[in-house]
Amino acid sequence: MTGNLVIIAAAAVLSCACVFVLIRRAAQLGLVQAPEARSSHVRPTPTGGGIGIVAGALVAGLSLPGTDGISFLILALGLVIALVGLIDDRRPLPARVRLPVQALVVAALLWSTGAAGALAGGLPPVFHLGAAVLLLIGVLWWINLFNFMDGIDGIAGQQAILMLLSAMLIAFGTVPGVTGGWTWWMMAATAAATFGFLVFNWPPARIFMGDAGSTFLGFTLFASAMLSLVAGWLSLPQWLVLAALFAGDATVTLLVRLLRGENVAQAHR
C-alpha cells in the first residue's frame, strides 16, 4: 500500500508541475482563453491546464499494480478523448468531428467492460438498443458537461474530487478488499491529479482545464462508475446521487434557457 500512496502523491505533484509550466508557456502554445459570456474571468486566462490532470492520472494508472488489458484500454481511450480536446483547445473543432470520436470511445468502453450488458440486463431484449442509444447520449452529455462548467473557477475540479472520494469511501466501507484492486487506486490517482490542478484553478483561477482536461475527467469518472458497477461495488442510483447536483445544475439551466426561447448553443454567464 505504501507504494500506491507514493504513486498517488506523485500524480498530484506531476499534475501541479505541468500546470505550473503551462501557465508560463500558455501564450507560446496557443492556450490562452479570452473572456466570454459563460466564463467568470474578465481578462485573458491560460487554458489547457487539464493536461496536468491527464499526465498525472495516466502515469499513475500505468504505474499502479494490477494493470491489465482493460486498464490499458481505458487509459488509451482517455488519452484519445484528451487529445481531441487538446486540438479543440488550440483550434476549435466542430461538433460533427468531436462528438463522433467521443461516441466511438464511449462505445468501446461500454463494450470492453461489459457495462452495457450489466445496465440493460434487467430490460427485455426489445428495449436493449433503445437503452444503449439513450445511455450513449447521456454519457456524451456528461463528458461535455465538464467542459460546459469549466468556465466557473474551481467548480469542475471540486465536483470530480467530491465524486471520486465519496465513491471510494462508500466502496471502502462496504466492499472487503476493495483497496487491493486497480480501479480504487486509479480513482484516488485521478482525484490527486485533479487536486494538483485545482491549486491553480481555485478562485480567482490562474488557468482553466480546457477541453483536454474537462472531457478526460468526465470520461474517467464515467469509466470509474462503469468499472465499479460491473464489480458490484456501487449501484447506478448511488452514482446518480453523487452526480445529481452538478449535472442537475447545468441541465436545469439549459432547460430554463430553452423554455425562454434563448439560444442554448450560445454561451452565457
Where are the language model's segments positioned?
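"…together with the soluble PPM/PP2C metallo-phosphatase catalytic core" -> "…together
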Residues: 2-251
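Membrane-proximal soluble regions of multi-pass membrane proteins
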Residues: 242-269
